């Protein structure tokens, strides 16, 4: 099995990258892909860059160049569920765009023409992630993760997301684009991220302060998930 792992920012991939043995680097289209073994498992780790376009382009390059069997999207996210705090884990059962609106033509809010309203995460990957969470005794929430090309830092943006997606547990800027690409390539995916901030008016300050905490937690989860998947 080869596992593809995607993070947007240097801070979100550096801890994992440093653990990859026999590491080789592919630089293409503004993305970097690091291949090798993580705990004896073949992996391809992508640093995509921030935002939906960068994430989609990077995911496509990763799938074409390295042909992983599954994709794990990792990194940080803003918490929307009331039970979440910095360092907690969110696991996707579905991903949707929060900034797409073609409702004038009868589509659901967040749905693009020719696409499902939401992209479902692979049930086996979700179950494996939840098994790791239990083993590590982490606080976690499973549910809808929404993505858009905006850092949500204020009551107006937050209110809009909560109005359109009251069930959403977290918000970030890449996961749904990655899920979209995986859907088109028919490759199973799951989003496993750690909370760096709770989406409110001070979220930019929290993000800067706690990104390192989120990176450590998400790295811990991904390492354990990779080993879990390799064991079958």
From Swiss-Prot:
Database matches in Pfam families: PNP_UDP_1
Pathway listed: Amino-acid biosynthesis; L-methionine biosynthesis via salvage pathway; S-methyl-5-thio-alpha-D-ribose 1-phosphate from S-methyl-5'-thioadenosine (hydrolase route): step 1/2
Ligand binding (substrate): 78, 152, 173-174
Reactions catalysed: S-adenosyl-L-homocysteine + H2O = S-(5-deoxy-D-ribos-5-yl)-L-homocysteine + adenine; S-methyl-5'-thioadenosine + H2O = 5-(methylsulfanyl)-D-ribose + adenine; 5'-deoxyadenosine + H2O = 5-deoxy-D-ribose + adenine
EC number of the protein: 3.2.2.9
InterPro entries from the UniProt entry: MTA_SAH_Nsdase, Nucleoside_phosphorylase_d, Nucleoside_phosphorylase_sf
Residues at the catalytic site: 12 (proton acceptor), 197 (proton donor)
GO biological-process terms attached to the record: L-methionine salvage from methylthioadenosine; L-methionine salvage from S-adenosylmethionine; purine deoxyribonucleoside catabolic process
Transmembrane segments: none
Keyword flag Cytoplasm: no
Domain of life: Bacteria
Keyword Hydrolase: yes
Signal peptide: none
One GO MF term: methylthioadenosine nucleosidase activity
Assigned keywords, A-Z: Amino-acid biosynthesis, Hydrolase, Methionine biosynthesis
Quaternary state and interactors: Homodimer.
Record-stated family: Belongs to the PNP/UDP phosphorylase family. MtnN subfamily.
Protein purpose: Catalyzes the irreversible cleavage of the glycosidic bond in both 5'-methylthioadenosine (MTA) and S-adenosylhomocysteine (SAH/AdoHcy) to adenine and the corresponding thioribose, 5'-methylthioribose and S-ribosylhomocysteine, respectively. Also cleaves 5'-deoxyadenosine, a toxic by-product of radical S-adenosylmethionine (SAM) enzymes, into 5-deoxyribose and adenine. Thus, is required for in vivo function of the radical SAM enzymes biotin synthase and lipoic acid synthase, that are inhibited by 5'-deoxyadenosine accumulation.
Name the record gives this protein: 5'-methylthioadenosine/S-adenosylhomocysteine nucleosidase
Gene coding for it: mtnN
